[in-house]
Amino acid sequence: MLDYDRLATLIQRTKEASDFVIVFPHWGTEYNLGTDASQTEQATFLAAQGVDLVIGTHPHVVEPIDYIDRPDGGKMLIYYSLGNFQSLQRKEATLLGGMAKVTIKKDFKGARIVDFDMETLVTDYRLGGVRVTDYFDIITTYPWSKYSRAIAESGNIGNGNANFNLDYMFQLQAEQAAQVHEARQKAGLE
């Protein structure tokens, strides 16, 4: 159970000693592509404390990105979950992850986010000839921009999971890109 009073105290101490506050909560529901009520509640609390950036972990899948107003007039960027950077899980959406790209500027106005994005990552795995585990022994994380149909088709996409195929991967990446675009629009970046 989250101790809100203790967390508020820790955030306040951090704000007093720094120009920009980032929180990395372990939250959410595993494999849920959306957010849950506890994440929404905690995000509202973090915004009320003046947090600048939230990068969530735990669900193993990419969840929405949001850019919200704080009660103090500032803004808070939330990556609810970036999913897995690299994964040997066999659930469909766990093989796509995200890498946050955030530009923070500090000047006479203070420190603030001036740009952000997310690059989709793809975990590709295959056998290299020598089986050393029950899993694949060559695991590569590709940026979406470098992953191709040829790479996917030459590997073990989905490891036999019929629900995870190249078409599903393209659909999921398009949904992730749309969420990033929407958050960037809210921030006035597009």
Predicted regions and their residues:
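Acidic, metal/ion-coordinating pockets
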Residues: 1-190
